[in-house]
Amino acid sequence: HTVVSVGTRTTHIVVVQNGVPLFVRIIPAGGESMTDALASLSGESRANLELAKHRLGLDGVSHSQFSELSRAMFEAVRPLIVSIRSTIGYYNGLEGSSPVESVILLGTDSRVPGLPRAVAENVQLPVRLVSPLEGLPLGSGVAPGAFDEFALDLAVPVGLALGSV
């Protein structure tokens, strides 16, 4: 698998096999590039632009009313998608490597509508969103859904915590 954690301004791409990271690439781009693209077209506040990004996403291209905004977001995130594809291509070309079979997306901005589909179309592999909390038991004092809003951003802390167990 290739695990892609889309951060605000940094994205981590990690090729993993049997739970072992084999190849890591850090890209100086993230979901904020889509917000920046919206800001260049609108005088709205950053908070409103973040909401628009997560409501409209990349799928608005087919709606004439929103096509310019979605197209701008797609163009802003395209270099990141190309980096994912080139990282997988590079790794697959290494002698003795097993081919990457899928992409796992993490990070709040991985939930931008249309982003998983755009990645899947460009890398020609199945893509799925995964919560780092999936399969982990939560304490009895933790309300169900307490972490839902930011669970996709917890990959690094959860990984570090599990690594120390």
Model feature map: region roles:
Residues 1-165:
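Hydrophobic/aromatic-enriched cytosolic interaction surfaces used to assemble or bind macromolecules
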